[in-house]
């Protein structure tokens, strides 16, 4: 149902993002990155391109507005997301996960590049790891995001002592 792309090797990412075939773009399609949210909010307000009521995006926090755009899209389709967690709090990542799960069950597909252990935890996700061994399937518990988060939560004091030494 879902493919999550993880990793940060530039050469692998460049190859993964190469467009081999151009597809028709629907009237409500757009490219959304957390970094370009302000520009999109301005365009949505000015052109009212079928985004629903987006007139208040500039009045919202960055994360709330970003989530509003994501939640306003409910139609079946293929959704490509590049690190959507970068604009979202932990709680709002859970909101996005719930939304994606419902949409996937209704026939939508997602391809997501993420480092979020929350988004990687989506039930039935097919997780692909991009690392020095190439691209390969990876179990949730074997992702760096999950393992590092687990170590931090379970062993925070000792990890901080190791990282910060006498500075603590």
What function would you assign to each model-found segment?
Residues 1-7, 11-12:
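Single conserved hydrophobic/aromatic residue that forms the stacking wall/gate
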Residues 3-4, 72, 121:
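Solvent-exposed polar/charged
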Residues 10-11, 33, 113:
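Hydrophobic beta-strand positions within the nucleotide-binding domains of ABC ATPases
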Residues 13-31, 153-157, 161-164, 168:
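Extended, highly charged alpha-helical segments
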Residues 15-25, 52-54, 90, 95-104:
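Catalytic phosphate/metal-binding cores of nucleic-acid and nucleotide-processing enzymes, i.e., regions
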Residues 28, 75-78, 104-111:
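Loop/turn-to-beta-strand initiation segments
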Residues 29-95:
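Conserved ABC ATPase signature
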Residues 91-112, 116-168:
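C-terminal lobe/lid and adjacent interdomain/linker elements of RecA-like ASCE P-loop ATPase modules
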């Amino acid at each position: 149902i879902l493919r999550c792309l993880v990793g940060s090797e530039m050469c692998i990412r460049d190859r993964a993002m190469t467009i081999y075939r151009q597809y028709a773009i629907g009237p409500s399609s757009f490219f959304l990155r957390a970094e370009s949210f302000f520009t999109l909010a301005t365009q949505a307000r000015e052109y009212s391109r079928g985004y629903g009521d987006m007139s208040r995006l500039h009045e919202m926090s960055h994360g709330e507005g970003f989530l509003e755009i994501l939640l306003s899209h409910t139609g079946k389709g293929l959704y490509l997301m590049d690190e959507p967690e970068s604009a979202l709090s932990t709680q709002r990542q859970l909101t996005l996960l719930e939304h994606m799960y419902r949409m996937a069950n209704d026939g939508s597909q997602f391809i997501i590049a993420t480092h979020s252990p929350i988004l990687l935890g989506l039930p039935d996700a097919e997780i692909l790891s991009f690392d020095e061994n190439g691209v390969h399937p990876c179990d949730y518990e074997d992702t760096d995001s999950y393992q590092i988060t687990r170590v931090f939560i379970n062993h925070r004091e000792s990890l901080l002592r190791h990282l910060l030494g006498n500075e603590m």
